[in-house]
């Protein structure tokens, strides 16, 4: 694939990178053909690469940069903290301040345990659910991504009633034998699996909006159904809000959809561009973590003062007005995608919620992972490359989502819509 854009320096760096970094990248999704562009700097809603190209960014580091890149308030706060130290190994007051802010926002949050990533957060939440219930089995949904740890890195498409098979070499089948897979938005499948595993299921973990398979929305009443059936059967409900937390609303998907889970995990936006994650939930469960309880969870950089400082400064800016503005931007782009697809007679389905959106090149509605997989991924990549050539960067995968930030202004949206029109016309 030859791109009609100057990327000589990025090509050189990629060839060099492959000598030292596996595949030339540190996370697989960053790799795309013929090679990824290498970023030199970022500001507001723009990425600037090593060849001097400017890209309007709708990937936003896969979600965290909701205030835009290099936000001055965050940078100033972090610089001040760095003068005071970057890691302590003992508590600091700022951990309390951020915990209070999380508790004030997230409906289920009565206590918090800070960790270093979304992966650590979901891993800890599942361990906590198993520990407090004394049960081993968990339910996850096909296509849902809850981090790269063994219990949830499970092959999808195995059917609602079969035990999961590992999705990666290096994971023993015994590790995932207690992971039950179910299609998203399928109430009957949930009922059946719970019925056939009575009193054995510790938790259901889900992304309230499936953001790691594009943007699959919960059907009306589905989250309420999950809340009711888990309560009826003594199963903990875990909302993985690593993507939706602080993005759909101040209180994330729980506030947006009016559903209160037992536990929730957050990350991404919480760190304002720095590594962080958090497990939150009801006090009766959270206090079972050590040192109060017997369920072990620990980390050298848990509650890191730099990440916590960035988190405090980020959440200060996320009020109701902010969400109205970022949602409006995503609505404009989503509507334009629908109109442009119709204009050029392209089969496409566009889904959006708050400041998250994605287009699937598909004739049918996308409500499950299997629906998403049936989309025309080759067409999506042609769409991606044309956008890139016209100065717009979205995640290089049909199975990721796009985000708006507060920095995507009217001029930026106009340029984006022009690029979308060119890309759709070329399809």
Curated annotation (Swiss-Prot):
Gene3D superfamilies: Aspartate Aminotransferase, domain 1, Type I PLP-dependent aspartate aminotransferase-like (Major domain). It is an enzyme of class 5 (isomerase). InterPro entries: 4pyrrol_synth_GluAld_NH2Trfase (IPR004639), Aminotrans_3 (IPR005814), Aminotrans_3_PPA_site (IPR049704), PyrdxlP-dep_Trfase (IPR015424), PyrdxlP-dep_Trfase_major (IPR015421), PyrdxlP-dep_Trfase_small (IPR015422). It comes from the Archaea. Its cofactor is pyridoxal 5'-phosphate. Transmembrane segments: none annotated. The modification N6-(pyridoxal phosphate)lysine is found at residue 268. Keywords: Cytoplasm, Isomerase, Porphyrin biosynthesis, Pyridoxal phosphate. Its EC number is 5.4.3.8. Pfam families: Aminotran_3. It is found in: Cytoplasm. GO terms for cellular component: cytoplasm. The keyword GTP-binding does not apply. PANTHER family: GLUTAMATE-1-SEMIALDEHYDE 2,1-AMINOMUTASE (PTHR43713), GLUTAMATE-1-SEMIALDEHYDE 2,1-AMINOMUTASE 1, CHLOROPLASTIC-RELATED (PTHR43713:SF3). This is Glutamate-1-semialdehyde 2,1-aminomutase. The lineage of its organism: Archaea, Methanobacteriati, Methanobacteriota, Methanomada group, Methanococci. The gene is hemL.
């Amino acid at each position: 694939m030859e791109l009609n854009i100057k990327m000589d320096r990025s090509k050189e760096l990629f060839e060099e990178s492959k000598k030292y970094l596996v595949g030339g990248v540190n996370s697989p999704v960053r790799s795309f053909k013929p090679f990824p562009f290498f970023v030199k700097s970022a500001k507001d809603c723009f990425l600037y690469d090593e060849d001097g190209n400017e890209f309007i960014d709708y990937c936003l580091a896969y979600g965290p940069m909701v205030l835009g890149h290099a936000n001055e308030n965050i940078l100033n706060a972090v610089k001040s903290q760095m003068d005071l130290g970057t890691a302590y190994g003992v508590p600091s007051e700022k951990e309390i301040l951020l915990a209070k802010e999380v508790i004030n926002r997230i409906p289920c949050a009565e206590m918090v345990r800070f960790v270093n990533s979304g992966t650590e957060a979901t891993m800890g939440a599942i361990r906590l659910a198993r520990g407090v219930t004394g049960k081993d089995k968990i339910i996850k949904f096909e296509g849902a991504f809850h981090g790269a740890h063994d219990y949830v890195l499970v092959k999808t498409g195995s059917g609602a009633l079969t035990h999961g098979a590992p999705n990666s070499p290096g994971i023993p089948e015994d590790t995932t034998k207690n992971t039950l897979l179910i299609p998203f938005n399928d109430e009957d499948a949930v009922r059946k699996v719970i019925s056939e595993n009575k009193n054995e299921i510790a938790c259901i973990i889900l992304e309230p909006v499936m953001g790691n398979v594009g943007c699959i929305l919960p059907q009306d009443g589905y989250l309420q159904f999950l809340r009711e059936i888990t309560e009826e059967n003594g199963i903990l409900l875990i909302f993985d809000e690593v993507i939706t937390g602080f993005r759909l609303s101040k209180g994330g998907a729980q506030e947006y959809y009016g559903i209160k889970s037992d536990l929730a995990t957050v990350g991404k936006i919480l760190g304002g561009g720095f590594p962080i994650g958090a497990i939150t939930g009801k006090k009766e469960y959270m206090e079972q973590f050590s040192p109060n309880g017997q369920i072990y969870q620990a980390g050298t950089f848990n509650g890191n003062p730099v990440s916590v400082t960035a988190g405090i400064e980020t959440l200060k800016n996320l009020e109701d007005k902010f969400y109205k503005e970022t949602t409006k931007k995503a609505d404009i782009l989503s509507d334009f995608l629908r109109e442009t697809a119709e204009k050029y007679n392209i089969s496409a389905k566009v889904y959006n919620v708050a400041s998250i959106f994605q287009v699937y090149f598909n004739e049918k509605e996308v409500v499950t992972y299997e629906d998403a997989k049936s989309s025309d991924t080759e067409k999506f990549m042609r769409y991606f490359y044309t956008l890139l050539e016209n100065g717009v960067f979205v995640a290089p995968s049909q199975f990721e989502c796009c985000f708006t930030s507060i920095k995507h202004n009217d001029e930026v949206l106009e340029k984006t819509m022009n690029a979308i029109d060119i890309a759709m016309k070329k399809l």
